[in-house]
A protein has these predicted regions:
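Zinc-dependent metalloendopeptidases
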Residues: 1-239
Length: 239
């Protein structure tokens, strides 16, 4: 998440266009559609009869061959151990359109029709960043947005940029009966939006003081469990 914050503070306005803005730093929200409804199961991608969730995508022709390979590695991160499969779009009406726009961001969950995922080159073309934005497209918010997060972390409000305080709001999320995941690829880092170099989020329990918040490379085991539970896939192999 630190890489996303850095890229978006440099390149992406919090206002994408006249009807869309960014919430929590990288979640696109349209004024005509409240993204909170996507915390429910109404914004899921359809599951196929074979038990997998096939998500069609289209890649911008602006990406180089190497950049395309990185994006596909980010997809493979999400696919491994889950029922999700990303497939090149042919005729599908619902699909993600991956574009090299300004900053790194995605809409939350399936919206129907074409929906943009922005992966600006080169700042957003890191495998972990790509996987993070695809997780938003699957319907997942940031881990520290969980309604029960105050039992696990302390938000250090005085250390946060004043105009970014709303990025630390809590929401009535469906936690899928899974534990709080300090190592989720969807968790803010300890210094996210720090105005003075001091931590903005710290683990609450003494035995978790040395735990690193978030990660930048791959999904955690719990991230994968979340996908399979949200989409009712059961246990999936890594093929």
């Amino acid at each position: 998440m630190d890489e996303i914050i850095k890229a978006n503070e440099l390149h992406a306005s919090r206002i994408i266009d006249s009807t869309t803005s960014l919430r929590e730093g990288d979640i696109a929200v349209s004024s005509g559609r409240r993204s909170k409804v996507c915390f429910a199961r109404s914004c899921l991608w359809n599951k196929s009869v074979d038990g997998r969730v096939y998500i069609a995508y289209r890649l911008s022709t602006e990406y180089t061959e190497m950049e395309t390979k990185l994006i596909k590695k980010g997809m493979e991160n999400v696919e491994k151990g889950t029922c999700v499969r990303f497939v090149p779009r042919t005729h599908q009406e619902d699909y993600i359109d991956i574009q090299a726009k300004s900053g790194c961001w995605s809409y939350l969950g399936a919206r129907g029709g074409r929906q943009t995922v922005s992966l600006q080159s080169p700042d957003c073309l890191q495998v972990g960043v790509i996987s993070h934005e695809l997780m938003h497209a699957l319907g997942f918010v940031h881990e520290q947005s969980r309604f029960d997060r105050d039992s696990y972390v302390t938000v250090m409000w005085p250390n946060i940029w004043r105009d970014r305080l709303r990025n630390f709001e809590k929401f009535r999320t469906d936690n899928l009966d899974l534990p709080y995941d300090y190592g989720s690829i969807m968790h803010y880092g300890m210094y996210a939006y720090s105005q003075d170099g001091e931590p903005t989020i710290v683990p609450k329990n003494s035995n978790t003081k040395d735990i690193k918040l978030g990660q930048t490379t791959s999904l955690s085991h719990i991230d994968k469990l979340k996908i399979n539970k949200l989409y009712n896939c059961g246990d999936m192999d890594d093929n």
